């Protein structure tokens, strides 16, 4: 009489994450369309390998490549069922994950993938695309050398000028904070020149005109503001308090208070609620 062997595997939140990443957003299909696997690539495709890795990152809160292979091996039957094909732990070895990361670092792969992912996310979740917030951040590293491309010393927001860092320009839909663009640049790159590059990319992903771009005073550079207006969009940014601007600002406010200029009411979207006056 044949015996039945029962295998227990912990599924945790893996099916839920796969439903979102694979079934709803189809990240694996998008990457495989943009960067089809080489003929000698066996097992999980590049896109499926990426989604498996993303699932590990989100489920385990761990981005280390070396941990993914053992993690998949613990649930091999689950992964075979989810992907509909045999899944080997070697399909997600650190060598393969490194190749995924290398491919994603190529602009000819990353930029169209980011565009398609954003468009699909906006469509699936019916996100409002009216306001985009732009900002930069830095991440310090304890390695790197003089020949490093990304890891450079620059103005440190972590107050650690002795450490090398990389810089990231991020674009997110307001008010949800949904990320729609990311550029990774060397840590000594000035912020000013990153805004136009990001906005130009977003114009092929989001509506090209009619958006409000929001940023800090570094977005207030004249060239950036001119580009936003020239492309049919609006901007909201504080002007940097440098040069003669503080004195000019005092005069502008004084003129408004003394009634020397004509003030126009600013109304909320309902057309009735007054938000203030300006000129």
What is each model feature region?
Residues 137, 185, 218, 239-240:
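Anionic group-transfer/hydrolysis microenvironments
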Residues 180, 205, 230-233, 239:
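Compositional signal for N-terminal targeting/processing segments
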Residues 193-210:
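Short, basic/hydrophobic alpha-helical segments
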